[in-house]
Amino acid sequence: MTAESMMFNGAVILMVLVLFGLAWGFLILKIQGGEAE
């Protein structure tokens, strides 16, 4: 496993985690907002 492939895998994992975190946070905000109303 070369350093380039490790960097590429790390970038892919990082992007997936960021997208998952944004979706999760948006879902929680939506649920909390619905309960508040």
From Swiss-Prot:
On whether Kinase is a keyword of this UniProt record, the answer is no
* A single BP term in Gene Ontology: photosynthesis
Which chain regions cross the lipid bilayer?
Answer: 11-29
Keywords of this protein's UniProt record, alphabetized?
A: Electron transport, Membrane, Photosynthesis, Thylakoid, Transmembrane, Transmembrane helix, Transport
Protein name per the record: Cytochrome b6-f complex subunit 7
What Gene Ontology molecular function terms does this protein carry?
A: electron transfer activity
Assembly behavior: The 4 large subunits of the cytochrome b6-f complex are cytochrome b6, subunit IV (17 kDa polypeptide, PetD), cytochrome f and the Rieske protein, while the 4 small subunits are PetG, PetL, PetM and PetN. The complex functions as a dimer.
Return the similarity comment: Belongs to the PetM family.
- Role, per record: Component of the cytochrome b6-f complex, which mediates electron transfer between photosystem II (PSII) and photosystem I (PSI), cyclic electron flow around PSI, and state transitions.
User: What species is this protein from?
Assistant: Crocosphaera subtropica (strain ATCC 51142 / BH68) (Cyanothece sp. (strain ATCC 51142))
Q: Where found?
A: Cellular thylakoid membrane
Membrane-protein topology: Single-pass membrane protein
Question: Record's GO cellular component, any one?
Answer: cytochrome b6f complex
Upper classification of the source organism reads: Bacteria, Bacillati, Cyanobacteriota, Cyanophyceae, Oscillatoriophycideae
Matching Pfam families? PetM (PF08041)
